Amino acid sequence: DWAAPESNNGMVLGTILEVRVGKNAPNYDGSVKSWWNDSQAGNALRTTYTSIADRFIEMNAGTGVTNLSIWYPEQNINDVKPYPWTLFQTQGNCATIEHVTLVNSYNGFNSAPSELHYVLDSYITALNKGIEVHVCTDIGRIENVSISPEYWAKSGLPGAPTLAELTAYTKANSVGFQMHRSDWEYISYLHISGYKTGIWIGREPGFADAPNAQLYEVHVDNCENGLYVEDVNPYGILISNSSFGAAKGGNAVYFYKDFSTSTQFNGVEFSGPIVSDGSDGVISFESCLFGKYSDYALKINNGNVLLSQCHFENADKHVYLGMNMRTLKSVNSGHKQRLKINNHSNDAKIEIITDKKYAFEPIPKGLKTNIIAHPRPVSNQVLKADFSRATGFNNQRPVKDISSELQSALDALKASGGGTLYLPAGRYLVDKPIKIPSGVELRGSWDVQHHTQNGGTAIFTNYDGGDAGENAPSLIQLETNAGIRGITLAQLNIISGEYSAESPRKTPFLIQGQGPKVYVINVTIAIGDKGIDLASYDTSGHYVDYLGGVPLRAGIWVGGGAEGGFIRNMQFNPHYGSRLPEGGQGYPRVAMMRFVQSNCSALKFADVKNQTIFNNFVYGSVYGIHFLKDEITGKYPGKMTMIGHGSDGCTYSLFVEDADKDTKIIAVNSELVNTKIPNEPVRSYVLMGKEMNTSKVHPDAKLILYNSAFWGSPVFGAIINSG
């Protein structure tokens, strides 16, 4: 049981774990020199320092800590003692922390070399480090997390210090969020207040690997350094619609001498100075606001700065250029568009442009990224199923088809008022289509995101549509306001018989929505031809959150006139098909990277309006994200908001095939990447219109990209044939 502190005047309520071990532990944050093979760099041998620190809760692959608070009753703000990490992800993938309050941890959560951590909807007071990330090689996510002294101070627990004395300590000693190497970290709605360093970004101890990341709605205040950037990898940091505020005498942002790459700010407010001692690189500011600086808003001693449509609150002392400054370019920036520069550089190239013809619409604010009320069945009634299944750490597959029994149980639950049908952990065989009735949820053992490797509740199938093939009904059909949660799906016969990894079996979509407000949450596709069909019916208000896996030809396709839907935290990567749980557990092992890169369309949007596409990622696809005319309604994509989308290893990372005059796609923090794919001679980050002078994309159709990053091996950066 757990309650959010901010909803209870800061009080810590519900389940509380009292930690009375580890006080003054000598190995509270120990590490040893070690070596590892980097799968992201051709298995190159790396040298690093691996944590061997003690920890209170060790989180291995496929684990979650949810709905509780953790408190150290013997900690004393007047005599602070170190304790081991409260939560520690050791290795592997998929460690989730959700609805957790760390009342007064010394060190909060450590993600050691691993993948796919997810910290969300949680609160932390940490006396040394709140969250620390090391060598995350597949998308880590931090979402809606608050780190502040107030959660201990206002907890109502015995021995809690005053907010003033606790803040004095954390501002002198503590770091809120510390990120070493992380490949494509997604950080959103992170709030940090009252720390010596709010966010620290930099290298791994012992070698030069650093992170790239995107930050959205990140707000830091009252810190000596709101954001401290030691170094960033060549792909850069994107920061949008955020704010960084300094304590008195501090810096809103500081760049250390090792910084030499790229950091992009868009729609960011700064309270206090930005200081850079970086050796080179580019720092760009677009639609930013600079305020509350006593000396200079920007003190740049080296490198390159770009200013676009930025406002400075003070009339002077906007930019100080140090001796080794290389370039300053400004467009429509300054106080009332008058930019004041104190130039001490040897030979910096300075270009100032003030002209209305270069004015543009700034990044939109207040974008909605999540649903107000999360979907759930209409009743609290839970029915636990007891069907034939395979269990254990072996390679056995289920042999009895439970389709009829499962459908009967779902129908009976509907008849009794709706609710949840719970499938305990194990592997179930479902070889005929089932329909989840309105108001009913089919739920497995997973309460958090998970990988094929983690086992749990799984539905295995050989269903391929029979004579109708891929056009037959879907295996799992969701009626209006029906959902599926916490289950893994596996198409057993995808490469059996006459089919192979080069030519896998075509099947219907595994899941189909057949009405409004359908939902799919924490579902993994271990292997399947097609994922979720939200295009054949109007599924307005649909909600998909953390669909992981490896669909081969189609991921999530949306259309049918749907309005107001959400697709969030999609995570597609071919390794879901080749990393199996202990003992194999009957899953087919398939390596499909080459096939998906030439055949998959991961995300497809047709006749939809007011769609929210948030923090999704696909590795390996022809089209990472694809917009086109609806085959059923004949209508075009409408207005959509896309925040934090990542396409990696794709032929075309973003493809607008069809669009009319009302199509408007707003994209923020996009990371669009091509790799050199065999048999794909033309590749580009963006393709708008498939052919030159195409009539399928209206000249007034809009694709608006704010704060984007592009890298890889394109033939052309962007191919714009219309719009």
Which stretches of residues belong to each language-model region?
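Feature marks extracellular polysaccharide-active and adherence modules
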Residues: 1, 20, 66, 71, ...
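Extracellular "leader-to-stem" segments immediately downstream of a signal peptide or signal-anchor
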Residues: 2-78, 98, 143-145, 149-167, ...
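The right-handed parallel beta-helix/beta-solenoid scaffold, focusing on the short coil/turn
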Residues: 15, 43, 61-66, 85-86, ...
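Short, flexible coil/linker elements and helix-boundary hinge sites characteristic
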Residues: 30, 328, 417, 634-635, ...
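Short glycine/acidic-rich loop motifs that flank beta-strands on beta-rich extracellular proteins
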Residues: 74-80, 85, 105-112, 127-135, ...
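Hydrophobic alpha-helical scaffolding
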Residues: 177, 395-399, 603
